[in-house]
């Protein structure tokens, strides 16, 4: 089976954005100072110019995350990543399904999974800065407050998550264009 240009773009972007999103979730560089950085599932202590000398603590359960807003953000962001991953698996499986209407049964749920992933991830990204009001964040960032980072700087991990979700907004549209392309090919082949 030959995959269309838009179909190839949809598959490649879905897989790449899923990987980048997962990588940014596991990053400790969401908010940082010179010696401490913290993210959704990890925080590291040590000089940032010497990453080999940093000590990192990974949160394995929700109870280990220090603040309720951190827990809510973790659930939302992880849920968004799972939906994005599920959509990427569906899109990837679409490439091996034989030509026909069965493709539509995979493409449409993939698009809905990707739309849901974007919505849930945006909510998680909006909730995470509420974590700055916690006692944990105030110990690191000084006089931090909701959406005010105090002595902390915004890190590349948080920015990468924002850029990834912005690019993920295009995935359902690419999938819709791809589905229209499939329908056109089916109609033309029956004529």
Swiss-Prot record:
Regions that span the bilayer: 6-26, 72-92, 112-132, 154-174
Superkingdom field: Eukaryota
Record keyword Transmembrane helix present: yes
Keywords, sorted A to Z: Membrane, Transmembrane, Transmembrane helix
One GO term describing the cellular component: membrane
Topology versus the membrane: Multi-pass membrane protein
Membership in a protein family: Belongs to the TMEM211 family.
Protein name: LHFPL tetraspan subfamily member 7 protein
Lineage of producing organism: Eukaryota, Metazoa, Chordata, Craniata, Vertebrata
């Amino acid at each position: 089976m030959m995959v269309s240009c838009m179909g190839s773009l949809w598959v490649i972007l879905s897989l790449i954005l899923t990987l980048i999103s997962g990588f940014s979730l596991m990053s400790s560089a969401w908010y940082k100072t010179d010696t401490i950085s913290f993210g959704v599932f990890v925080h590291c202590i040590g000089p940032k110019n010497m990453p080999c000398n940093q000590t990192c603590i990974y949160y394995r359960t929700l109870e280990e995350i220090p603040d309720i807003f951190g827990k809510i953000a973790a659930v939302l962001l992880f849920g968004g990543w799972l939906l994005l991953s599920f959509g990427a698996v569906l899109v990837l499986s679409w490439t091996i399904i034989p030509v026909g209407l069965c493709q539509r049964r995979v493409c449409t749920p993939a698009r809905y999974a990707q739309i849901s992933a974007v919505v849930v991830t945006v909510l998680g990204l909006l909730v995470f800065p509420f974590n700055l009001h916690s006692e944990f964040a105030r110990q690191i960032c000084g006089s931090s407050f909701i959406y005010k980072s105090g002595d902390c700087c915004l890190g590349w991990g948080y920015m990468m998550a924002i850029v990834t979700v912005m690019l993920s907004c295009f995935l359902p549209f690419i999938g819709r264009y791809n589905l229209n392309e499939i329908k056109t090919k089916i109609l033309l082949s029956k004529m």
